[in-house]
Amino acid sequence: MATFDRNDPQLAGTMFPTRIEANVFDLEIEGEIPRAINGSFFRNTPEPQVTTQPFHTFIDGDGLASAFHFEDGQVDFVSRWVCTPRFEAERSARKSLFGMYRNPFTDDPSVEGIDRTVANTSIITHHGKVLAAKEDGLPYELDPQTLETRGRYDYKGQVTSHTHTAHPKFDPQTGEMLLFGSAAKGERTLDMAYYIVDRYGKVTHETWFKQPYGAFMHDFAVTRNWSIFPIMPATNSLERLKAKQPIYMWEPERGSYIGVLPRRGQGKDIRWFRAPALWVFHVVNAWEEGNRILIDLMESEILPFPFPNSQNLPFDPSKAVPRLTRWEIDLNSGNDEMKRTQLHEYFAEMPIMDFRFALQDHRYAYMGVDDPRRPLAHQQAEKIFAYNSLGVWDNHRKDYELWFTGKMSAAQEPAFVPRSPDAPEGDGYLLSVVGRLDEDRSDLVILDTQCLAAGPVATVKLPFRLRAALHGCWQSKN
């Protein structure tokens, strides 16, 4: 029998498991769905299907994919488990068999050699495929309508990396997808693999290189001519794994390395810039101005997850606050330094943009924001996954426009839908799941980006609660 400790901070509030597979036809709607919204809003959520082990972490739950399917003003909802070999093994045993996060030395002997990924972090759509991905393994292909699992996906044998980022980048001009694999030859390796995939699913470029030290890597940045790889001091260690300790340790004395690689370059061509110890989970966008690379991203002083640190200091939440920041890398400089500028002080994460304008100087970005002037319905452990507001960042005004979700509500990562294929940048709608914590259920809100603070133009009402998701995407029917 599954049991979940409601006093566990990682199982509280928006993060309490729901474990619901559902197929809900014709959802209730308040307001009117804009005509532009025809397609699917995909999401991926970590959900523990069985009782968690004492040392569990939220980000290690099984993948539970979901989709809101929009057609002609009507909305249907579906959610399905991502049926990985790990999921199937634990379902058969009716108990947890896999141990600490990304540490195979803590697993039950019966699952030795089984793919450990839970494919729980993002949904990727490209070359007609819908993929559930997590960075510790290859993605799993899903049926675009039913979300039933079709199997592990290696691009028909073209991707030999053991791992695949949950945050590939897309070139709106060429239709290419760019991706990397970190610890690409296994958890204990420094190897990085980098691929470019054309719009038809063919790998057109591949190269490999080594990290300066073994590190947790979640996201990267791409411009027209460059790919940028941030290596930050959340380090991994074979010795720690064998000692059955957490895989990562925060080692600020190592500093950070920022690798800049020509977009179709070879691993030997990478140039390393340096920065102090810092952490970046998510990149907004990157572009070039002459010989400079500019990157907007969410930067914090330390890794926001409480892994051990080399100074044996307690976890400090005040240093784990992600803030919108701009990096500037001068490729003509004679040194390895870069410039970093904080753009705003508010806690903000899960950024997206109008991806039609990716890889160029953009004006708008969209994200979850904790407005300090408003009450929070969520707790410390839920930060990064839930927010009291949704925000539009304007690079011209250098400020946010915010919509407050409500005293007992919390928003999740948004998705952007343009008003029309040729609409100006940022002219469209934001979609976000909002947890109504006092009602134990969720809504999907639709906000007009031209008047965000006015509130939803339509609300899709679910009869149950959705757990805090990690990432999703919008896929138009066209």
UniProtKB/Swiss-Prot annotation:
Alphabetical GO biological process terms: carotene catabolic process
pH-linked activity: Optimum pH is 9.0.
Swiss-Prot/TrEMBL cofactor(s): Fe(2+)
Residues involved in Fe cation binding: H167, H218, H282, H471
Keyword hit for Iron: yes
GO molecular function: carotenoid dioxygenase activity; metal ion binding; monooxygenase activity
EC number, as in UniProt: 1.13.11.88
Xref: PANTHER family: BETA-CAROTENE DIOXYGENASE, CAROTENOID 9,10(9',10')-CLEAVAGE DIOXYGENASE 1
This protein's name: Isoeugenol monooxygenase
